[in-house]
Amino acid sequence: MRLSRFFLPILKENPKEAEIVSHRLMLRAGMLRQEAAGIYAWLPLGFKVLKKIEQIVREEQNRAGALELLMPTLQLADLWRESGRYDAYGPEMLRISDRHKRELLYGPTNEEMITDIFRAYVKSYRNLPLNLYHIQWKFRDEQRPRFGVMRGREFLMKDAYSFDLDEAGARRAYNKMFVAYLRTFARMGLKGIPMRAETGPIGGDLSHEFIVLAETGESGVYCDRDVLDLPIPPASVDYDGDLTPIIKQWTSLYAATEDVHDGARFEAEVPEERRLHTRGIEVGQIFYFGTKYSEPMKALVAGPDGAEVTIHGGSYGVGVSRLAGAIIEACHDDAGIKWPEEVAPFRAVILNLKQGGSDTDAACEQLYRDLLAKGVDVLYDDTEQRAGGKFATADLIGIPWQIMVGPKSLAEGKVEVKTRSDGARQMMSPADVVARLGGGTVAG
């Protein structure tokens, strides 16, 4: 993509309404535009990041055996009355009526609808276990939306729902999502720490929040520092095997949100030098809720002996749009964003330091074509902006690889390459740049 043809409305000044780093940088970098309190338009740069986050979530859900579907944003109020949650949910739920006076709601979550789908089609234990998920926009009418996408009213979520014949099966499903979440956040450059948490309006008796440590987080958390060094399960993990050792490894060390924190246990189990009390951002939460929805909604299947059995369920959420903000909170400096490669809007940016110069123009064009041919998602800054402005833009939007093409280095057959993550610079030939980013062999 040529920057001269890309829509990137960068702000020179810090927005006054932005209270935290991620909100400020997302607005400044032209990722978002606020349309109303807690409601944002995702502009091209931000939308590219959002789609890359979504794809990682999708790949890890599929790897764990979940099946994707898509449910509507609007739901019938009667479904929620069946579960007893319509009146209990509170003013955060947006309730509306259509022209026929039918009561609807803009779904803040989907336990009722997915249970309705399940009971309509699944009648036998032979169709279990089953895990269905979707990635869809949600709405919760927050009383005080703030912090940009971290606490908005409209947001993109991945919701998965598991159905099993008994509690043992449901806990196996829970463990699969536990492991999938560890891998999902790690691929985004984050350490999502599973912490015991309250179940809230979802209900049930077992839940973990996945927390990214950040001083700007809304959640107070307590944990053993050693949890930060635990290994992430590899891509080769066998989801059909016994995941209990992984779960025990991650849950044997103390980690809890402030809502369920046990001070006496914390002090008894964790040596003082390993006690960590800080704040964090919730990026996902998983629940085992047994028969909370299947019982009132009569989601039954025929068991092995032919008798009807009430299924056991769980739900598993990831804040897809919130993750964009969480990644920035964890990956930034004073100059701007430092995107991990897997979620960066572009993997590399070519900076033409003498726009209009025949040699630099030709070298940039060739490098641009060669990188595209290798499948590299590259941005070419072909604008008339001065070099200093191009450096500032590249740092602000956080592209992992900055390739600087100037007359002096080009005279030696080289370009300068800077990695945004650590600021390291090196001189490389254009061919070596293409080989490095395109997966080939670097000369020498």
Swiss-Prot record:
Catalysis: reaction(s): tRNA(Pro) + L-proline + ATP = L-prolyl-tRNA(Pro) + AMP + diphosphate
One GO MF term: proline-tRNA ligase activity
Pfam families: HGTP_anticodon (PF03129), tRNA-synt_2b (PF00587)
GO biological process, one term: prolyl-tRNA aminoacylation
This protein's GO CC annotations: cytosol
Entry annotated with the keyword ATP-binding: yes
Swiss-Prot/TrEMBL keywords: Aminoacyl-tRNA synthetase, ATP-binding, Cytoplasm, Ligase, Nucleotide-binding, Protein biosynthesis
InterPro entries for this protein: aa-tRNA-synt_IIb, aa-tRNA-synth_II, aa-tRNA-synth_II/BPL/LPL, Anticodon-bd, Anticodon-bd_dom_sf, Pro-tRNA-ligase_IIa, Pro-tRNA-synth_IIa_bac-type, Pro-tRNA_synthetase
Membrane-spanning intervals of the chain: none
Enzyme class at the top of the EC tree: ligase
Compartment(s) of residence: Cytoplasm
Role description: Catalyzes the attachment of proline to tRNA(Pro) in a two-step reaction: proline is first activated by ATP to form Pro-AMP and then transferred to the acceptor end of tRNA(Pro).
Family of the protein in this entry: Belongs to the class-II aminoacyl-tRNA synthetase family. ProS type 2 subfamily.
Subunit-structure text: Homodimer.
Protein name: Proline--tRNA ligase
